[in-house]
From Swiss-Prot:
Top-rank lineage group of the source organism: Eukaryota
The record's note on its domains: The DFDF domain is unstructured by itself. It assumes a helical fold upon interaction with other proteins.
Gene source species: Gallus gallus (Chicken)
Location of the Sm domain: 1-68
Name of the molecule in the record: Enhancer of mRNA-decapping protein 3
Length: 506
């Protein structure tokens, strides 16, 4: 009796923990009380193993989905422990319709097996089934029945709203030649029954490997070349139309060395964009400023331009808009400005005036001298009109660290100032304050007791500064291009859209 069920397609429910398995019966062992399925599916997903074996104790419900062989006579009923080794397991069959369209149910004894009629006979007679355990139709019949029901649901879907509101009204059927033609077209497209369901999945990778994409693309390209048309995705071809931000003309090669000095530079720098900026000697730089002054770039203009560029750099070093905004008025940055009695000191005073105008607390140190330069006197008169503080003694400088120290103590002409007591005291204070130092136009020579700067700002063209100058920046003080040419420098501005740019050592 157990061998009669071999080849049947069944569905085994093993409870919530193990789930539902479907497959074809390959073996039924009455001794060990097991049943085996080949090509199993677990909860609708194909299993990786070719065969699965179940014990009778794990099975909650067993349903027969399809009995093999349309001409074979199979028996279906309660599979008793003596026959199949699986006690209390039945099979289900979908309801068969008789002449009245109703399903007849009749309980039967679980001790006696019951014959299952042939498929041809099942269509014309009612099946006597158990009220709790039912034998289902074949898998193909149930699938076709589902398709027919779904078709009927689609046809009735459009009249759902009217029928639900007026249940007694019947929607009139549309008639006419046009509707009949449409119905026949629908039947031609959707009315065919499914003859067979393929058992194997479609091999996408294998069929994709058969497609020679290179040959197809070559054929398309050859056809388009002959017909004169061009595809948008064809490589190595320029588009016929350009976007609004594209240049039609080919750009010339980039020249990175645009500044040429008459003598070999001891040191070269480069900008962020890669432009080479050579350094110049102190004598050439002094000559450049002298010629510019003859052309109208006076000392007052140069001091003003230097003060603006240096203050812009200092403001960015202090934090820029993140530090200097109305929400931080209680945290004004403090800058200590150390100036000597020379032109470079006047440049620092001009920078301090602009910083004070931008709500920065500036403490200006300038030693007392009997006679001052006119440029220093003029800058001090302007600085005194601001809220900045001027001191002449190191004792008046703050004991706590400041936000920034601006160094304008050194120059090339007055080297003897380094031996003065006030100079040494100021240098010691700056080194002990532990604040970052910005040097404006520092000299070339290394000083024994100088202040190590973190940043240095050069004017026009940089000098060959040493390592103690820190990171070098370059500012534009407005020297015309013809002035550079007059001193023998082939010059092209490296600043772009900025007045202060960083330089990198090459």
């Amino acid at each position: 009796m157990a061998t009669d069920w071999l080849g049947s397609i069944v569905s085994i429910n093993c409870g919530e923990s193990l789930g539902v398995y479907q497959g074809r019966v390959s073996a039924v062992d009455q001794v060990s009380q097991t049943i085996s399925l080949t090509r199993p599916f677990h909860n609708g997903v194909k299993c990786l193993v070719p065969e699965v074996t179940f014990r009778a104790g794990d099975i909650t419900e067993l349903k027969i989905l399809e009995i093999p062989g349309p001409g074979d006579s199979r028996q279906c009923g309660d599979l008793q422990q003596a026959d199949t080794g699986i006690p209390g397991v039945g099979c289900q069959v979908g309801p068969s319709q008789n002449g009245t369209g109703k399903m007849l149910k009749k309980p039967f004894s679980s001790s006696a097996p019951q014959n299952i009629p042939r498929r041809t006979d099942m269509k014309n007679q009612d099946i006597i089934i158990s009220p709790q355990q039912q034998c289902s139709k074949s898998y193909m019949d149930r699938h076709m029945e589902t398709l027919s029901q779904s078709k009927g649901f689609r046809r009735r879907h459009n009249s759902w709203s009217s029928s639900s509101r007026h249940p007694n009204q019947v929607t009139p059927k549309k008639s006419g030649l046009k509707n009949g033609q449409m119905k026949s077209k629908d039947d031609e497209c959707f009315g065919d029954d499914i003859d067979e369901i393929p058992d194997t999945d479609f091999d996408f990778e294998g069929n994709l490997a058969l497609f020679d994409k290179a040959a197809v693309f070559e054929e398309i390209e050859t056809y388009e070349r002959r017909s004169g048309t061009r595809s948008r995705g064809t490589p190595n071809e320029k588009p016929a139309r350009y976007r609004h931000d594209e240049n039609i003309l080919e750009s010339e090669p980039i020249v990175y060395r645009r500044i040429v000095v008459p003598q070999n530079a001891n040191k070269e720098f480069c900008t962020d964009s890669g432009l080479v900026v050579p350094s110049v000697s102190y004598e050439l730089h002094k000559k450049l400023l002298s010629v510019a002054e003859k052309h109208g770039l006076t000392l007052e203009r140069r001091l003003e331009m230097t003060g603006v560029c240096a203050s812009q750099m200092a403001l960015s070093l202090l934090g820029g808009p993140n530090r200097l905004n109305p929400k931080n008025v209680h945290q004004r940055p403090t800058v200590a400005l150390l100036c000597g009695p020379h032109v470079k000191g006047a440049q620092g005073i001009s920078c301090g005036r602009h910083l004070s105008n931008h709500d920065v607390h500036v403490i200006l140190f300038l030693p007392n001298f009997v006679k001052m330069l006119e440029s220093i006197t003029n800058e001090l008169n302007l600085f005194s009109s601001t809220q900045g503080q001027q001191v002449s003694s190191v004792k008046d400088l703050p004991d706590t660290p400041v936000d920034l120290v601006i160094n304008c103590l050194d120059c090339h002409e007055n080297a003897f100032l380094r031996d003065q007591p006030w100079y040494k005291a100021v240098v010691d204070w700056a080194n002990q304050n532990r604040a970052p130092v910005l040097s404006i136009d520092p000299p070339i020579s290394e000083m024994e007791q100088g202040i190590d700067a973190k940043w240095s700002l050069a004017l026009g063209l940089p000098l060959p500064l040493g390592e103690r100058a820190g990171r070098v920046y370059l500012c534009d003080i407005g020297i015309p291009q013809k002035v550079f040419q007059e001193v023998g420098i082939n010059y092209h501005s490296p600043f772009g859209c900025k007045f202060v740019i960083p330089l990198h050592s090459t």
